[in-house]
């Protein structure tokens, strides 16, 4: 069962039952309510360029420099189009959380609106295809190769343009395959060379019991093996 909500004059529709960081969000376009079993899903139907006006200020502070906002916009637009080409959901192209891109967690802003409008239609591409522009809010200073995180079911490989490297200026290749190199990288980073060194999540600590660590690793390995068994080699009890 579905129902659609629109306004006669095209004004945004405020959803008072939702709370975001700035209050109750108001959505442009059409709102579709879908009932599936005991759940209700609220789907916002609107053009990509209007969608981006709700994404960019939610993913990057509107106070950032205009060129940074434009870069974020191009990444967000590229991500959105690749998601539309490869939908995860039966009733929508994306969701509004960090599982895709955060949408309408911050109100729209003239500065981010301008970034969207001034880059209209611009995307990242690789070999004439729109690139899947995955991005993040914080890291330890190192990027991973796409093969290490995401792979395509038909090839078992990721996107070749996403390669492992350190987030330095200029970028440098990763050399963290040995235990000693990784420990040194974590404990003694050259803070002035990493772009995110001032971020509070650049380095952090947590204490876990060995039981919890074993349980977490076993669960994660089991899930990854089920999803992509070809990437694992099992060691038998006899070596």
Task: State what each model feature region is.
Residues 1-239:
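Conserved, single-site charged/polar hotspot
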């Amino acid at each position: 069962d579905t129902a659609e909500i629109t306004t006669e004059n095209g004004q945004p529709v405020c959803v008072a039952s939702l709370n975001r960081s700035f209050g109750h969000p108001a959505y442009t376009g059409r709102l579709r309510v879908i009932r599936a079993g005991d759940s209700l899903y609220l789907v916002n139907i609107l053009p990509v360029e209007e969608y981006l006006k709700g994404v960019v200020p939610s993913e990057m502070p509107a106070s950032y420099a205009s060129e940074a906002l434009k870069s974020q916009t191009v990444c967000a637009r590229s991500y959105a189009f690749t998601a539309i080409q490869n939908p995860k959901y039966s009733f929508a192209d994306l969701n509004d959380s960090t599982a895709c891109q955060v949408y309408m967690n911050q109100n729209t802003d003239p500065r981010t609106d301008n970034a969207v409008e001034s880059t209209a239609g611009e995307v990242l591409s690789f070999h004439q295809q729109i690139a899947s522009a995955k991005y993040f809010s914080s890291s330890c200073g190192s990027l991973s190769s796409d093969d290490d995180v995401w792979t395509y079911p038909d090839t078992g490989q990721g996107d070749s343009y996403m390669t492992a490297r350190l987030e330095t200026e200029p970028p440098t290749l990763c050399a963290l395959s040995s235990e000693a190199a990784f420990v040194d990288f974590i404990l003694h980073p050259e803070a002035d060379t990493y772009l995110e060194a001032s971020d509070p999540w650049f380095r952090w600590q947590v204490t876990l019991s060995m039981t919890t660590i074993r349980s977490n690793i076993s669960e994660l390995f089991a899930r990854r093996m089920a999803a992509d068994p070809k990437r694992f080699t099992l060691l038998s009890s006899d070596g």
